[in-house]
A protein has these predicted regions:
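Conserved NTP-donor binding/palm subdomain of two-metal-ion nucleotidyltransferases/polymerases, i.e.
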Residues: 2-137, 143-364
């Protein structure tokens, strides 16, 4: 079976290599590779941290360091890093304690009303690892089919403010305006075939004890699939840096928890939802930090090279557009006319790429 990567253009191969270096810097790659080892030595950690300053690092680097401190108690970080690590742990705990009562309440209400549901993403990881101090911005819960609207009516009557999007509705605390729980009618993975996944998730879901109730979560393989697609989305949209870091540790846990993943399930999910190419991009990026995670040749034989090239173009244009639009300032445009023309060029491109997923197959 030929390796489909050789069917990519040189510029696409170069971009994937370049993108890996944009997503993870050199020290982050060293730390993540080290963190995936069963046991690490103090000398190995000190070597990886050489020249790195946690106070100047972004949220991704700090989150990686925090996870290492929790998963590898056999090593210790420099004393000047401990305040930052403690602050991260405190933030995780405070946020979780804010969300937990609503999390449990929503589960109990859905159970009492006989509505089907599955906990997704970070919320599901909290069910799998209730004592692990993981940052959880909000809880994502899948309530598919006709049960979706019934659930929204129930929570609206219970006083929650609703914030609707295409695939989900956020429940906000009316007192604080904070987002607490997202109710999904289907898993938001960026394709029109996403609805097909709901039935597959339900058929393999696990029921686990959680707090004072039980919760239904995707099996480890389905969790891995959703995580990989979300990783590609986060990379493309330049969002959730700490989520990208957490995802690496989530993947390792899920593989260890299952005692060995059934990769045919992950492939089946990708084919069902038409996200094979997105998984391939995630795999290529994550191989730099999780070299032994994926089986050899995973997903390669399912790749449509033409679709992959288009998706790489979409990823490239979206990232470039977001960077330019985010950093644009009128004062800068006055000083530099080329930045103004670049702004409008990418604004038009970004409109079409995001809304109609047109794949502009040209050099940036």
């Amino acid at each position: 079976m030929p390796d489909n990567r050789i069917m990519l253009r040189i510029k696409d191969e170069f971009y994937l290599t370049e993108l890996t270096q944009e997503v993870f810097d050199e020290v982050e790659i060293k730390m993540l590779r080290l963190a995936m080892s069963p046991v690490i030595t103090q000398a190995e950690l000190d070597s990886a941290l050489c020249g790195w300053d946690i106070h100047k690092a972004g949220s991704k680097g700090q989150t990686i360091a925090f996870n290492i401190s929790k998963t590898h108690p056999e090593v210790s970080f420099p004393k000047e890093y401990l305040n930052v690590l403690h602050r991260i742990g405190l933030s995780c705990r405070e946020r979780y304690l804010t969300i937990l009562p609503h999390f449990v309440k929503v589960i109990k209400v859905l159970e009492a009303k006989g509505l089907d549901f599955i906990i997704l993403k970070g919320g599901a990881m909290r069910v799998y690892r209730p004592d692990y101090p993981r940052w959880t911005a909000d809880i994502d819960i899948l309530v598919p089919g006709s049960h979706y609207k019934k659930a929204l009516d129930i929570f609206k009557n219970k006083g929650y403010s609703l914030f609707k999007s295409i695939h989900s509705t956020g429940l906000k605390d009316p007192a604080t305006g904070q987002s607490l729980v997202d109710i999904h009618r289907f898993v938001g993975i960026g394709t029109i075939k996403a609805k097909r996944l709901s039935r597959e998730l339900a058929g393999r879901a696990l029921t686990l004890k959680f707090s004072s109730t039980t919760a239904i979560v995707p099996c480890p393989e389905d969790m891995v699939f959703i995580s990989l697609v979300n990783f590609w989305k986060n990379v493309t949209d330049i969002t959730s840096e700490n989520s990208m870091a957490n995802l690496c540790f989530d993947l390792k846990f899920l593989k260890d928890y299952s005692g060995g993943l059934n990769w045919d399930i992950v492939r089946s999910d990708a084919r069902t939802t038409d996200t094979v190419e997105a998984l391939y991009i995630s795999k290529r990026l994550l191989e730099a930090v999780l070299p032994d995670f994926f089986p050899e040749g995973f997903i390669d034989e399912d790749i449509d090279s033409s679709k992959l090239r288009k998706l790489i173009s979409r990823t490239r244009y979206t990232r470039n557009s977001i960077s330019i639009l985010r950093d644009f300032s009128l004062l800068g445009a006055i000083k530099n006319a080329s930045s103004l023309s670049q702004y409008f060029f990418y604004r038009v491109k970004f409109f079409f790429v995001k809304r109609f997923h047109l794949m502009f197959d040209k050099d940036c």
